[in-house]
Structure formats: C-alpha cells, structure tokens
Swiss-Prot record:
Protein name according to UniProt: UDP-N-acetylenolpyruvoylglucosamine reductase
Species name: Dinoroseobacter shibae (strain DSM 16493 / NCIMB 14021 / DFL 12)
Primary gene name: murB
Gene Ontology terms describing biological process: cell division; cell wall organization; peptidoglycan biosynthetic process; regulation of cell shape
Region (Disordered): 200-227
Pathway: Cell wall biogenesis; peptidoglycan biosynthesis
Length: 307
C-alpha cells in the first residue's frame, strides 16, 4: 500500500471520532485523497473487512475495537453542485450543509437539516425526518465495490425501506444525486429554523448522544406535525416501560427524550449497549413492542476485568 496518497494509520483509536466518545481502535484507518486513491486501497487487500465511517453520529464502537479497515471520506468527497432542482453531493458532505445549500438555491431538501451525519450515510440507512426520506429524493449514487470497481446505484438497486437499504456489503458510496421540489429560499430557510427550534426544545442536543437509539416500531418516521396521533413511537413505548432516565454506569436514557442514549461522562460502549438491551427487554415486557436498534454497533467487546 506504499503508493497510496491518503492517510493510512494502524491501530487508530476511534472513540474521539464518534459522538458518544467510546470504543477501541481499528486495525487500519484510511482517509483517501480521492476516488482513485480509494479504489487502489480497496484493491490492495481484498480479504480485509471494511467499514465506512462518516462523522460517527449514529455509531457505537465496542470497547475491543474493530478488526477491519475503517474508511473515512474527507475533503475530496464533500463537494456540492446544484443544477436546477438536482443536487449532486459528495458522500462526505454533511446532511445539514446540503440542506442549507439546496435551500439557498431554491431546492427543498429541508428534511436533511436536522439529521446528523453525511449524505453517504443517509443513503445507506434511508435517513428521514418530518415524513420525508432519502428514498423520496434519491436519483442515483456513484460507488466503489469492495474490489474497487466504479458502479452506479439506482433506486431499484438499493430497495429502500424504513431505515434500511440493500447497499451491498463493502460498497463505498462516493457521490449522490438527489432531486427535490422547488421552493422559495426564504420559506425553506424559515422551515429549517422552525425544525431546529423544535429539535432544541425536545432533544438533548447538548449531550453526548448518537441520535435516535431505536427505530419507531410503526416502521416510519414521525411527521413532526402536532396532529400526528400515531402512538407507536420509540420514545413513547420507552416512556411507557418506565425507562426514561434509566442508567447503567455512566450510560443513561435521556430524561429529555427517552429514545436518546447518553454518555453522561466516562461511559463504556459496553454500558451503553447493555442499557439499550435492557430497554428493549423492558419495552417488550411492558408493551409487546420489539424495538430494533437504529444506532449501528460494530466491533469486538472489550476484555472483562478480573474479579
């Protein structure tokens, strides 16, 4: 791998790259210079598992770290270009940045404004908010296969579902094309400001969290409307099970919004994941709803200290 132009690091700790600030090291950590550099890296070691990491906003890295190569796209993958109502964004572009740029150009991608993460991650998990999903605006994506081959992914290829897509394992999205409805920039800006105010009022935005911990049992996102009477929301069933504010070590289900798992200071990945599993158990016992993790959990457990 001597011809790579990006940055390659062995045994790179990952905790400082995740919002929850937990987790062990990755065997390899690579930040490619561009798509050609990324393709060369992928071809160089076909047997090694790879994991694509965005900004670490929806992620628990377990305490034992990751026996894989972690790829993090950076400056060479965050450009944004707008042509009419079509928006072409690098996979590393932040969702919020794309929403703002699109709004300024009169394109409505406002649902992305409050979603923490990158556009590549938004495609992989069909991110959505306020009743709109990536699937609703997705046109196509450029990607590299695990073998380093450039491909184009269509909506049919990805088979979007609630918080899921059929992105092939090892595939790295590099660029995404979206198309949103037209709108007046001032109105779009006002809508995003309203969304941000609602988030600030209802979510623990100043705490160390990974965003929504569990998917809504109903299988769709909240619309955010006052008249949305749908009851099968993750936060509601967690509340019904009496788990708002529950703690395990330094891990806590937020008292402000019980579907947010919080590192109150010094929590381990094991504590966070264990509390999440306890919540799932209590919710099923109390309500009959099976919660499914929305936060991605990767890596090996840490060693248990001797008694």
């Amino acid at each position: 791998m001597t011809d790579l132009r990006g940055t390659l690091t062995e045994n790179r700790p990952l905790a400082d790259l995740t919002w929850l600030r937990v987790g062990g090291p990755a065997d390899l950590f690579f930040q490619p210079a561009d798509a050609d550099d990324l393709a060369a890296f992928l071809r160089a070691d076909l047997a090694r598992p790879v994991f694509v990491m965005g900004v670490g906003s929806n992620l628990i890295v377990r305490d034992g770290g990751l026996r894989a190569a972690v790829i993090r796209l950076g400056r060479g993958f965050n450009g944004i270009r707008i042509d009419g109502t079509r928006v072409r964004a690098g996979a590393a572009a932040l969702d919020a940045h794309v929403a703002r740029k699109a709004a300024a150009a009169g394109v409505d991608l406002t649902f992305l404004r409050t979603i923490p993460g990158t556009i590549g991650g938004a495609v992989a998990m069909n991110a959505g908010c306020y009743g709109t999903y990536m699937a609703d605006v997705f046109v196509e994506a450029t990607a590299l296969t695990r073998a380093g081959e450039a491909i184009t992914l269509t909506r049919e290829d990805l088979n979007f579902r609630y918080r899921q897509s059929d992105l092939p394992p090892g595939t790295v999205i590099t660029e995404v094309v979206m198309e949103g409805p037209p709108g007046a920039p001032e109105a779009l800006e006002a809508r995003m400001a309203d969304q941000l105010a609602k988030r600030e009022a209802t979510q623990p935005t100043k705490d160390r969290t990974a965003g929504s911990t569990f998917r809504n049992p109903a299988g769709f996102s909240s619309t955010g409307r006052a008249d949305d009477t749908h009851e099968a929301k993750a936060w509601a069933v967690i509340d019904a099970a009496g788990m708002r504010g529950a703690m395990r070590g330094a891990a806590q289900m937020s008292p402000k919004h019980p579907n947010f798992l919080v590192n109150t200071g010094g929590a381990t990945a094991a504590e966070l994941e264990s509390l999440g599993e306890e919540v799932r158990k209590k919710v099923f016992q109390a309500t009959g709803h099976s919660l499914h993790w929305e936060v991605i959990r990767i890596g090996q457990p840490g060693r248990t200290p001797p008694a």
